[in-house]
Every structure is written in C-alpha cells, then in structure tokens.
C-alpha cells in the first residue's frame, strides 16, 4: 500500500495549484495583465526548486513511505526514525535549523511580533458569512496558563489609512469587458451559423441537382433500353421477312442456302453488330449482282447483241 505517499504527493500538487491560483488572483486584483502559461511556468519552476532545494518534498515523501511501511507491518524504518528523532545530535541540529529559519524570516521583514501572532492565533472563516472566527492555538493557551498574556489598557485607537477601492467602477469595467466579450462571441456564433446555413443550402441544392440528374439518367437508360428492344425486334422481323421473301423466289438451292446462312449469322441481340452484318450482306449481294451483270454483258457481246439503259 502506498496510500500515504499518494496522499502526500496529492497535497504537494494541490499546494502548487494553490500557489498558481494565488499568484493569478493577486495579479488580477492589481489590474496587471498577464499570460497564464508564463505565470504557470514561472511558479512551477520556483516551486519545484524550493521544494527540492529545501528538502521538504523528500522529507514529506520519506515520512509517508515510513508510515506506509509501518501500516504494512514493517516497523524497522519507523524505529530508526524514532531513535533518530530522540538523539541529542538530531535535536541540536533541529534547533540550528529553527534558528536559521528565524533569521531568514527576520531578513525578509517578518519580525518577532508577526511570528508570535501567527503562532498564537488562527482565523476560521464562516461559510456563507463575511465575518470570521479568531481561534487561539495551543501555544496561546500555554502562554495564558503561564501568565505570559497581558491586557494593555492604554491602547489608543489610531486611524488607519486604508486604500479604498472603487468597487463600482471596477464592476463597471468588468461588466463592459464581459459585454464586449459576449458581443464578440455572439458575432462569431452568428457568422458560424450563417456559414453553416449556407453550407446546408448548397448541400441541399447539390442533392437536388444530383437527384434530378439521376432521374434524367434513369429516363435515358429506360429510353435506350426501349430503343434497343425495338431495334432487336425490327432486325429480327427484317431477317424473317427477307428469309421468307427469299424462299418464295425461284432461286437455286445453293444460292438460297448461302443467303440463309448469311441471314442466320446476323447478330440480332446487338444492333451495332447487326448493322455491320447487314452491311456485309448488302456488299455481297451487290458484288454478286455486279458479277452477273458482267457475265450477261460478255454473253451479249459474244452473241453480237447490244444493250442500252432506259
């Protein structure tokens, strides 16, 4: 189990977030414009440096690890820490650290009065109220028991100079900024809605055009299919008619068979191929007619006959 270590890490992370919020809130109250990412980066760098350089982070995580080990039944580390804390050298070192911290606080302008007051009193905020409760710490109770607390009756109320803040003007400025931001957001939203409507209208019109074109394509396809069927029927009837007409004529059987084979070779299914077949058949008929004419012409000359066209 590492629940205590996780809790300590969570407390450290929460402290960092609180430091960021405190920094940004202070800048906002002072009316200073800032970049959140820059503030976040600077606070994180300083916070990590202080926590690492001072050893506070490692100290907290180490104590949390010791508690987790004790909870898991491993008391060796806890016993060593207890012996270390009870050692006189450790106590002397802690006194030195406390004295160093006091001198550091004094150098930062935090005098003894402020340190004592902060150690003796704490403020408890009342939820939902502007007032607060001042609580005495255990140190204050010990001082009262030891008689180290006195009441100063010669206290003279001095007029404190307080910097007044015009909250009304501040509120009006914030309200103007909010209205300006709201107007810009509304303008962007309105323009986006108009663009979306235009895109939808274009899409609907395009869909209508596509539907109309698909309908026209379907009509043309139906018309083409009908034409193809009509041509197939026409070609089939033409072949049958020519075949019947040929059989009714007094032609030799070989010629009828040849013409019948050519008629049967016509592609009735595909009109384009049928036209090519008809062209070939007509060419053959013309060629046969030309040959017959030449034979007849030669025969007339051999018989000393002449021919004329009327």
Curated annotation (Swiss-Prot):
Chain segments carrying region Interaction with host ZC3H7B: 167-231
UniProt key word RNA-binding: yes
A single MF term (Gene Ontology): RNA binding
Region annotation Dimerization: where it falls in the sequence: 147-203
Predominant subcellular localization, coarse grouping: host cell
Spans annotated as Interaction with host EIF4G1: 205-310
Coiled-coil region(s): 163-234
UniProt entry keywords in alphabetical sequence: Coiled coil, Host cytoplasm, Host-virus interaction, RNA-binding, Translation regulation
Biological processes annotated in GO: regulation of translation
SUPFAM superfamilies membership: NSP3 homodimer (SSF69903), Rotavirus nonstructural proteins (SSF58030)
Region ranges (RNA-binding): 1-146
Location relative to the cell: Host cytoplasm
A GO CC term assigned to this protein in UniProt: host cell cytoplasm
Described purpose of this protein according to its UniProt entry: Plays an important role in stimulating the translation of viral mRNAs. These mRNAs are capped but not polyadenylated, instead terminating in a conserved sequence 'GACC' at the 3' that is recognized by NSP3, which competes with host PABPC1 for EIF4G1 binding. The interaction between NSP3 and host EIF4G1 stabilizes the EIF4E-EIF4G1 interaction, thereby facilitating the initiation of capped mRNA translation.
Subunit architecture: Homodimer. Interacts (via the coiled-coil region) with host ZC3H7B (via LD motif). Interacts with host EIF4G1.
HAMAP family named in the record: ROTA_A_NSP3 (MF_04094), ROTA_NSP3 (MF_04090)
Family as reported in the entry's similarity comment: Belongs to the rotavirus NSP3 family.
Descriptive protein name: Non-structural protein 3
Record organism: Rotavirus A (isolate RVA/Human/United Kingdom/A64/1987/G10P11[14]) (RV-A)
């Amino acid at each position: 189990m590492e629940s205590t270590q996780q809790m300590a890490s969570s407390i450290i992370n929460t402290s960092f977030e609180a430091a960021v919020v405190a920094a940004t809130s202070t800048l906002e109250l002072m009316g200073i414009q800032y970049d959140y990412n820059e503030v976040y980066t600077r606070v994180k760098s300083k916070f990590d440096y202080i926590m690492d350089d001072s050893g506070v982070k490692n100290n907290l995580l180490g104590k949390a690890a010791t508690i987790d080990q004790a909870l898991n039944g491993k008391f060796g580390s806890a016993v060593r820490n207890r012996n270390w804390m009870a050692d006189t050298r450790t106590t002397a070192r802690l006194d030195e650290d406390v004295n160093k911290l006091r001198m550091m606080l004094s150098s930062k302008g935090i005098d003894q009065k402020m340190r004592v007051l902060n150690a003796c009193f704490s403020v408890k905020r009342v939820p939902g109220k502007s007032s607060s409760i001042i609580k005495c710490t255990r140190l204050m109770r010990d001082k009262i028991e030891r008689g180290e607390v006195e009441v100063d009756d010669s206290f003279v109320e001095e007029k404190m100079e307080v910097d007044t803040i015009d909250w009304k003007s501040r509120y009006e400025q914030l309200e103007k900024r909010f209205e300006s931001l709201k107007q810009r957001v509304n303008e962007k939203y309105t323009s986006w809605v108009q663009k979306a409507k235009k895109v939808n209208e274009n899409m609907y019109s395009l869909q209508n055009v596509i539907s109309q074109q698909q309908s026209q394509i379907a009509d043309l396809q139906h018309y083409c299919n009908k034409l193809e069927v009509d041509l197939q029927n026409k070609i089939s009837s033409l072949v049958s008619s020519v075949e019947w007409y040929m059989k009714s004529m007094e032609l030799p059987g070989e010629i009828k068979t040849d013409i019948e084979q050519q008629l049967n070779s016509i592609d009735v299914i595909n009109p384009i191929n049928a036209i090519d077949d008809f062209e070939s058949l007509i060419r053959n008929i013309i060629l046969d007619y030309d040959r017959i004419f030449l034979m007849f012409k030669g025969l007339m000359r051999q018989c000393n006959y002449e021919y004329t066209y009327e």
